[in-house]
Amino acid sequence: MVLTNSKQPRKQRKALYNAPLHLRNSVMSAMLSKALKEKYGKNALPVKKGDTVKVLRGSFKGIEGEVSKVNYSGYKIIVEGVVNKKQDGKETPYPIHPSNVMITKMEDSDEKRFKTSNK
């Protein structure tokens, strides 16, 4: 899926900013683990709530957890176990871009997802 044909960064950013929600799904793709790549024949698939992912980049590198929320408007996902500690001791979820995670286990209740991934 191509949001724009331009190479200019400003137009790329604008296309992402103005993209409709139904096109943002493909931008929210994450790399698959080796086992899932062999099983589905794809390198990446969109992240869904319930998937188990491993963080590959950033200060939370190495943490594995379940996706509890997918924010299409902000292009971020919330992973259980990836939290910021506030000054008063409370923990707040830390949003991560899907390109910085790897899907290790997929949530399997959606049959359409597997039909499209087996093409």
Swiss-Prot record:
Lineage: Archaea, Methanobacteriati, Methanobacteriota, Methanomada group, Methanococci
Role of this protein: One of two assembly initiator proteins, it binds directly to the 5'-end of the 23S rRNA, where it nucleates assembly of the 50S subunit. Located at the polypeptide exit tunnel on the outside of the subunit.
InterPro entries: KOW (IPR005824), Rib_uL2_dom2 (IPR014722), Ribosomal_uL24_CS (IPR005825), Ribosomal_uL24_euk/arc (IPR005756), Ribosomal_uL24_KOW (IPR041988), Translation_prot_SH3-like_sf (IPR008991)
Quaternary structure, from the entry: Part of the 50S ribosomal subunit.
HAMAP family given in the database record: Ribosomal_uL24_A
Transmembrane segments: none
GO molecular function annotations of the record: rRNA binding; structural constituent of ribosome
Similarity-based family: Belongs to the universal ribosomal protein uL24 family.
Lineage: superkingdom: Archaea
Keyword Oxidoreductase (UniProt): no
Name listed for the protein in its UniProt record: Large ribosomal subunit protein uL24
Keywords from the UniProt entry: Ribonucleoprotein, Ribosomal protein, RNA-binding, rRNA-binding
Annotated organism of origin: Methanococcus vannielii (strain ATCC 35089 / DSM 1224 / JCM 13029 / OCM 148 / SB)
GO biological process per UniProt: translation
One cellular component (GO) term of this entry: large ribosomal subunit
PANTHER family: 60S RIBOSOMAL PROTEIN L26 FAMILY MEMBER
